[in-house]
């Protein structure tokens, strides 16, 4: 089974994964290229951040065979409730993308 993480957002433990499928969902939902994310640094636009979290949660649910009913608006509401959630999600994103870079170099 593919690797996913659990992340706590607004008191809920949610499955999250940033693989190729999540990145494709992100690009489709946001209209942004994944390669452009690095250009934002710490100033990622809210719309882009919501789409990134949404894509990771959607793919985490898919991989873990869990039901996924959240909309992007629901994700935004969860982020409103938990001021540190975006930081936790971005850490998972960085860790998972770092794992992919290491695997490619081997």
Where does each model-flagged region fall?
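Well-ordered beta-strand scaffold positions
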Residues: 12-14
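Short, hydrophobic/amphipathic alpha-helical patches that form generic packing surfaces
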Residues: 48-59, 91
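Charged interaction scaffolds used for protein-protein
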Residues: 1-10, 24, 28-47, 64-106
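Residue-level signal for threonine
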Residues: 19
């Amino acid at each position: 089974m593919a690797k996913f993480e659990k992340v706590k957002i607004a008191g809920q433990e949610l499955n999250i994964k940033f693989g190729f499928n999540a990145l494709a969902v992100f690009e489709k939902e946001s209209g942004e290229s994944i390669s452009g994310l690095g250009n934002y640094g710490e100033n990622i636009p809210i719309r882009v951040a919501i789409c990134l979290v949404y894509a990771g949660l959607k793919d985490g649910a898919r991989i873990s065979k869990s039901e996924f009913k959240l909309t992007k608006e629901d994700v935004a509401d969860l982020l409103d409730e938990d001021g540190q959630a975006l930081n936790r999600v971005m850490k998972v994103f960085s860790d998972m993308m770092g794992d992919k870079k290491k695997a490619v170099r081997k």
